Amino acid sequence: MFVVLVYDTAAERNPNALRTCRKYLHWVQRSVFEGELSAAQYRALMTTLRDQLDLTYDSIRVYRTRSPALVETEWLGVPLGNQDSVL
């Protein structure tokens, strides 16, 4: 599956969320990651994040699709993160 993950966490938890997401996905912009994951990788990522974050304060939003070809992406402004083609 192709995943776009966005997180908003307290500053003290940002480094952990960043490190965890980078193990599984490409960093594309500040708190935004994308990439292809198997079902097992997705479950492992979400379990790890769930254990690291305060779910009464932090939030994660995940968009999933079968293929990156189904996602249309448009960039404006200064590119951040890893600009290698994921799509």
Swiss-Prot record:
Top EC category: hydrolase
Binding of Mg(2+), residues: 8
Pfam family of the protein (one): CRISPR_Cas2
Top-level taxon of the source organism: Bacteria
Keywords: Antiviral defense, Endonuclease, Hydrolase, Magnesium, Metal-binding, Nuclease
Family annotation (InterPro entries): CRISPR_associated_Cas2, Virulence_VapD/CRISPR_Cas2
Keyword hit for DNA repair: no
GO biological process, one term: maintenance of CRISPR repeat elements
SUPFAM superfamilies (UniProt xref): TTP0101/SSO1404-like (SSF143430)
CDD domains: Cas2_I_II_III
Oligomer and partners: Homodimer, forms a heterotetramer with a Cas1 homodimer.
Its job: CRISPR (clustered regularly interspaced short palindromic repeat), is an adaptive immune system that provides protection against mobile genetic elements (viruses, transposable elements and conjugative plasmids). CRISPR clusters contain sequences complementary to antecedent mobile elements and target invading nucleic acids. CRISPR clusters are transcribed and processed into CRISPR RNA (crRNA). Functions as a ssRNA-specific endoribonuclease. Involved in the integration of spacer DNA into the CRISPR cassette.
Record-linked NCBIfam families: cas2
UniProt record similarity statement: Belongs to the CRISPR-associated endoribonuclease Cas2 protein family.
Name of the protein this chain belongs to: CRISPR-associated endoribonuclease Cas2
